[in-house]
Protein backbone atom coordinates (compact mmCIF):
# COMPACT_ATOMS: atom_id res chain seq x y z
CA UNK A 1 0.00 0.00 0.00
CA UNK A 2 2.79 2.38 0.85
CA UNK A 3 5.26 3.46 -1.78
CA UNK A 4 8.92 2.57 -1.56
CA UNK A 5 10.23 5.87 -2.97
CA UNK A 6 9.52 9.57 -2.46
CA UNK A 7 8.36 11.79 -5.30
CA UNK A 8 8.97 15.54 -5.19
CA UNK A 9 6.42 17.53 -7.14
CA UNK A 10 8.68 20.54 -7.64
CA UNK A 11 12.10 20.51 -9.35
CA UNK A 12 13.45 22.79 -6.64
CA UNK A 13 13.38 22.76 -2.88
CA UNK A 14 14.25 25.91 -0.92
CA UNK A 15 15.65 27.36 -4.12
CA UNK A 16 18.15 24.58 -4.78
CA UNK A 17 17.83 22.01 -7.56
CA UNK A 18 16.99 18.52 -6.41
CA UNK A 19 18.81 15.71 -8.15
CA UNK A 20 17.34 12.25 -8.09
CA UNK A 21 19.62 9.27 -8.19
CA UNK A 22 19.13 6.20 -10.32
CA UNK A 23 18.19 4.30 -7.18
CA UNK A 24 14.45 4.94 -6.69
CA UNK A 25 14.78 4.39 -2.93
CA UNK A 26 17.39 7.13 -2.39
CA UNK A 27 17.47 10.88 -2.96
CA UNK A 28 20.00 13.73 -2.69
CA UNK A 29 19.18 17.08 -1.13
CA UNK A 30 22.08 19.45 -1.70
CA UNK A 31 25.13 17.40 -0.72
CA UNK A 32 23.31 15.04 1.63
CA UNK A 33 22.04 11.66 0.62
CA UNK A 34 19.30 9.82 2.41
CA UNK A 35 17.91 6.37 1.77
CA UNK A 36 14.40 5.24 2.53
CA UNK A 37 13.51 1.72 3.54
CA UNK A 38 10.40 0.12 2.18
CA UNK A 39 7.47 0.89 4.41
CA UNK A 40 5.86 -1.59 6.69
CA UNK A 41 3.14 -3.00 4.52
CA UNK A 42 3.04 -4.09 0.93
CA UNK A 43 -0.59 -4.83 0.51
CA UNK A 44 -2.01 -7.74 -1.38
CA UNK A 45 -5.68 -7.11 -1.79
CA UNK A 46 -8.17 -9.95 -1.73
CA UNK A 47 -10.62 -10.28 -4.55
CA UNK A 48 -13.75 -8.14 -4.40
CA UNK A 49 -15.79 -11.32 -4.08
CA UNK A 50 -14.29 -12.25 -0.71
CA UNK A 51 -16.94 -12.42 2.04
CA UNK A 52 -14.39 -11.29 4.66
CA UNK A 53 -13.31 -7.95 3.18
CA UNK A 54 -14.86 -4.76 1.86
CA UNK A 55 -18.13 -2.99 2.66
CA UNK A 56 -20.24 -6.09 1.97
CA UNK A 57 -18.22 -8.38 4.26
CA UNK A 58 -19.71 -10.59 6.96
CA UNK A 59 -20.72 -8.48 9.99
CA UNK A 60 -20.90 -9.37 13.67
CA UNK A 61 -24.72 -9.71 13.71
CA UNK A 62 -25.23 -10.59 10.08
CA UNK A 63 -28.09 -8.63 8.49
CA UNK A 64 -28.98 -7.10 11.89
CA UNK A 65 -25.58 -5.49 12.43
CA UNK A 66 -26.50 -1.97 11.44
CA UNK A 67 -24.03 0.53 10.01
CA UNK A 68 -20.37 0.03 10.80
CA UNK A 69 -18.18 2.91 12.05
CA UNK A 70 -16.68 4.90 9.18
CA UNK A 71 -13.13 3.86 10.10
CA UNK A 72 -13.94 0.14 9.83
CA UNK A 73 -13.92 -0.31 6.08
CA UNK A 74 -13.21 -4.04 5.85
CA UNK A 75 -9.64 -3.39 4.77
CA UNK A 76 -8.08 -5.63 7.42
CA UNK A 77 -8.75 -9.27 8.37
CA UNK A 78 -11.06 -9.90 11.30
CA UNK A 79 -13.04 -6.67 10.82
CA UNK A 80 -16.69 -7.48 11.51
CA UNK A 81 -17.76 -3.85 11.82
CA UNK A 82 -18.06 -3.88 15.63
CA UNK A 83 -16.27 -1.33 17.81
CA UNK A 84 -18.64 0.08 20.42
CA UNK A 85 -15.72 1.32 22.55
CA UNK A 86 -14.09 3.17 19.66
CA UNK A 87 -10.77 1.38 20.16
CA UNK A 88 -9.99 1.52 16.44
CA UNK A 89 -10.88 5.17 15.83
CA UNK A 90 -7.29 6.39 16.08
CA UNK A 91 -5.22 4.90 13.22
CA UNK A 92 -2.00 4.69 15.24
CA UNK A 93 -3.71 3.00 18.18
CA UNK A 94 -5.53 0.68 15.79
CA UNK A 95 -2.24 -0.34 14.18
CA UNK A 96 -0.71 -1.18 17.57
CA UNK A 97 -3.80 -3.08 18.68
CA UNK A 98 -3.82 -5.09 15.46
CA UNK A 99 -0.25 -6.20 16.07
CA UNK A 100 -0.98 -7.04 19.71
CA UNK A 101 -4.02 -9.09 18.74
CA UNK A 102 -2.21 -11.10 16.07
CA UNK A 103 0.80 -11.82 18.30
CA UNK A 104 -1.37 -12.76 21.30
CA UNK A 105 -3.52 -14.93 19.04
CA UNK A 106 -0.48 -16.90 17.93
CA UNK A 107 0.77 -17.35 21.49
CA UNK A 108 -2.72 -18.38 22.63
CA UNK A 109 -3.01 -21.02 19.90
CA UNK A 110 0.37 -22.47 20.90
CA UNK A 111 -0.57 -22.23 24.58
CA UNK A 112 -3.94 -23.94 24.16
CA UNK A 113 -2.27 -26.79 22.28
CA UNK A 114 0.36 -27.04 25.01
CA UNK A 115 -2.32 -27.20 27.71
CA UNK A 116 -4.34 -29.94 26.04
CA UNK A 117 -1.83 -32.13 24.19
CA UNK A 118 0.26 -33.44 27.14
CA UNK A 119 -2.90 -34.27 29.08
CA UNK A 120 -4.31 -36.04 26.02
CA UNK A 121 -1.15 -38.14 25.65
CA UNK A 122 -1.11 -38.93 29.36
CA UNK A 123 -4.71 -40.15 29.26
CA UNK A 124 -3.68 -42.47 26.42
CA UNK A 125 -0.79 -44.13 28.23
CA UNK A 126 2.17 -41.83 27.57
CA UNK A 127 4.15 -41.31 30.78
CA UNK A 128 4.66 -37.76 32.01
CA UNK A 129 6.07 -36.48 35.26
CA UNK A 130 3.12 -34.09 35.33
CA UNK A 131 0.75 -33.70 32.40
CA UNK A 132 -1.50 -30.95 33.78
CA UNK A 133 -0.27 -27.69 32.32
CA UNK A 134 -0.31 -25.49 35.44
CA UNK A 135 1.37 -28.16 37.58
CA UNK A 136 4.09 -29.19 35.14
CA UNK A 137 6.43 -26.29 35.85
CA UNK A 138 6.63 -27.11 39.55
CA UNK A 139 8.46 -30.33 38.67
CA UNK A 140 11.62 -28.31 38.21
CA UNK A 141 11.72 -27.79 41.99
CA UNK A 142 11.48 -31.52 42.71
CA UNK A 143 14.55 -33.55 43.59
CA UNK A 144 14.76 -35.15 40.16
CA UNK A 145 14.16 -31.95 38.23
CA UNK A 146 12.01 -31.59 35.14
CA UNK A 147 12.32 -33.99 32.21
CA UNK A 148 10.82 -32.79 28.95
CA UNK A 149 8.19 -35.28 27.74
CA UNK A 150 9.13 -37.38 30.76
CA UNK A 151 12.39 -38.38 29.08
CA UNK A 152 15.65 -37.47 30.89
CA UNK A 153 17.65 -37.93 27.68
CA UNK A 154 15.91 -34.97 25.99
CA UNK A 155 16.13 -31.95 28.29
CA UNK A 156 16.81 -32.49 31.97
CA UNK A 157 16.11 -29.17 33.66
CA UNK A 158 16.97 -28.42 37.26
CA UNK A 159 17.46 -24.65 37.17
CA UNK A 160 14.52 -22.30 36.75
CA UNK A 161 16.96 -19.46 35.99
CA UNK A 162 18.57 -21.44 33.17
CA UNK A 163 15.15 -22.20 31.65
CA UNK A 164 14.15 -18.55 31.94
CA UNK A 165 17.38 -17.33 30.34
CA UNK A 166 17.10 -19.86 27.50
CA UNK A 167 13.54 -18.79 26.71
CA UNK A 168 14.44 -15.11 26.76
CA UNK A 169 17.37 -15.64 24.40
CA UNK A 170 15.57 -17.91 21.92
CA UNK A 171 12.26 -16.04 21.89
CA UNK A 172 13.97 -12.66 21.90
CA UNK A 173 16.13 -13.61 18.92
CA UNK A 174 13.12 -14.63 16.82
CA UNK A 175 11.07 -11.57 17.80
CA UNK A 176 14.03 -9.28 17.20
CA UNK A 177 14.52 -10.80 13.74
CA UNK A 178 10.84 -10.27 12.93
CA UNK A 179 10.61 -6.69 14.19
CA UNK A 180 13.93 -5.57 12.70
CA UNK A 181 13.00 -6.91 9.28
CA UNK A 182 15.68 -9.58 9.12
CA UNK A 183 19.43 -9.01 8.79
CA UNK A 184 19.06 -7.40 5.37
CA UNK A 185 15.77 -5.62 5.98
CA UNK A 186 14.05 -7.97 3.55
CA UNK A 187 10.96 -8.38 5.75
CA UNK A 188 8.41 -5.87 4.49
CA UNK A 189 5.59 -6.56 6.97
CA UNK A 190 6.64 -7.55 10.52
CA UNK A 191 3.20 -9.01 11.22
CA UNK A 192 3.38 -11.37 8.25
CA UNK A 193 7.13 -11.61 7.57
CA UNK A 194 7.01 -14.54 5.13
CA UNK A 195 10.38 -15.76 3.85
CA UNK A 196 11.95 -18.06 6.43
CA UNK A 197 8.74 -17.81 8.47
CA UNK A 198 6.73 -19.31 5.59
CA UNK A 199 8.70 -22.35 4.38
CA UNK A 200 5.56 -23.90 2.84
CA UNK A 201 4.81 -20.85 0.72
CA UNK A 202 1.28 -20.48 2.12
CA UNK A 203 1.31 -16.75 1.40
CA UNK A 204 2.29 -17.02 -2.27
CA UNK A 205 -1.29 -16.71 -3.52
CA UNK A 206 -2.74 -13.31 -2.46
CA UNK A 207 -6.35 -14.52 -2.25
CA UNK A 208 -5.47 -17.63 -0.24
CA UNK A 209 -3.22 -15.53 1.98
CA UNK A 210 -6.01 -13.03 2.68
CA UNK A 211 -8.32 -15.87 3.71
CA UNK A 212 -5.63 -17.45 5.90
CA UNK A 213 -5.26 -14.15 7.76
CA UNK A 214 -8.96 -14.28 8.64
CA UNK A 215 -8.75 -17.93 9.72
CA UNK A 216 -5.72 -17.17 11.88
CA UNK A 217 -7.51 -14.36 13.70
CA UNK A 218 -10.74 -16.32 14.17
CA UNK A 219 -8.89 -19.30 15.63
CA UNK A 220 -6.62 -17.00 17.62
CA UNK A 221 -9.56 -15.22 19.23
CA UNK A 222 -11.09 -18.56 20.18
CA UNK A 223 -7.73 -19.65 21.59
CA UNK A 224 -7.49 -16.52 23.75
CA UNK A 225 -10.93 -17.26 25.19
CA UNK A 226 -9.86 -20.88 25.70
CA UNK A 227 -6.76 -19.84 27.61
CA UNK A 228 -8.87 -17.58 29.81
CA UNK A 229 -11.17 -20.54 30.49
CA UNK A 230 -8.21 -22.79 31.29
CA UNK A 231 -6.95 -20.25 33.83
CA UNK A 232 -10.37 -20.01 35.49
CA UNK A 233 -10.72 -23.82 35.56
CA UNK A 234 -7.29 -24.18 37.15
CA UNK A 235 -8.20 -21.71 39.91
CA UNK A 236 -11.69 -23.08 40.57
CA UNK A 237 -11.32 -26.85 40.10
CA UNK A 238 -7.58 -27.46 40.32
CA UNK A 239 -7.83 -29.77 37.29
CA UNK A 240 -6.70 -29.75 33.68
CA UNK A 241 -9.04 -28.96 30.77
CA UNK A 242 -9.52 -32.57 29.63
CA UNK A 243 -10.26 -33.80 33.15
CA UNK A 244 -12.79 -31.00 33.55
CA UNK A 245 -14.37 -31.99 30.23
CA UNK A 246 -14.56 -35.65 31.30
CA UNK A 247 -16.19 -34.65 34.61
CA UNK A 248 -18.75 -32.51 32.80
CA UNK A 249 -19.63 -35.24 30.31
CA UNK A 250 -20.04 -37.81 33.10
CA UNK A 251 -22.28 -35.53 35.22
CA UNK A 252 -23.27 -32.35 33.38
CA UNK A 253 -25.83 -31.33 36.01
CA UNK A 254 -23.31 -31.04 38.84
CA UNK A 255 -20.17 -30.27 36.84
CA UNK A 256 -20.75 -27.04 34.96
CA UNK A 257 -19.81 -23.39 35.15
CA UNK A 258 -22.94 -22.39 37.07
CA UNK A 259 -22.56 -24.99 39.82
CA UNK A 260 -18.89 -24.15 40.33
CA UNK A 261 -19.54 -20.39 40.31
CA UNK A 262 -22.25 -20.64 42.96
CA UNK A 263 -20.22 -22.96 45.22
CA UNK A 264 -16.73 -21.57 44.73
CA UNK A 265 -14.94 -20.47 47.89
CA UNK A 266 -11.47 -18.93 47.37
CA UNK A 267 -8.70 -20.85 49.11
CA UNK A 268 -10.60 -24.14 49.29
UniProtKB/Swiss-Prot annotation:
Chlorophyll b 2 binds at residues 106, 155, 184. Binds at least 14 chlorophylls (8 Chl-a and 6 Chl-b) and carotenoids such as lutein and neoxanthin. The chain crosses the membrane at residues 102-122, 154-174, 222-242. It is found in: Plastid, Chloroplast thylakoid membrane. Disulfide bonds: none annotated. Chlorophyll b 5 binds at residues 167, 264. Keywords: Acetylation, Chlorophyll, Chloroplast, Chromophore, Magnesium, Membrane, Metal-binding, Phosphoprotein, Photosynthesis, Photosystem I, Photosystem II, Plastid, Thylakoid, Transit peptide, Transmembrane, Transmembrane helix. GO terms for molecular function: chlorophyll binding; metal ion binding. Pfam families: Chloroa_b-bind (PF00504). Chlorophyll b 3 binds at residues 159, 175. Chlorophyll b 1 binds at residue 60. Chlorophyll b 4 binds at residues 167, 178. GO terms for cellular component: chloroplast thylakoid membrane; photosystem I; photosystem II. The modification N2-acetylarginine is found at residue 37. It is a multi-pass membrane protein. Chlorophyll a 6 binds at residues 248, 257. It comes from the Eukaryota. Residues 1-31 are annotated as: Disordered. Chlorophyll a 2 binds at residue 104. Photoregulated by reversible phosphorylation of its threonine residues. Belongs to the light-harvesting chlorophyll a/b-binding (LHC) protein family. The light-harvesting complex (LHC) functions as a light receptor, it captures and delivers excitation energy to photosystems with which it is closely associated. The N-terminus of the protein extends into the stroma where it is involved with adhesion of granal membranes and post-translational modifications; both are believed to mediate the distribution of excitation energy between photosystems I and II. This is Chlorophyll a-b binding protein 8, chloroplastic. It comes from Pisum sativum (Garden pea). The gene is CAB8.
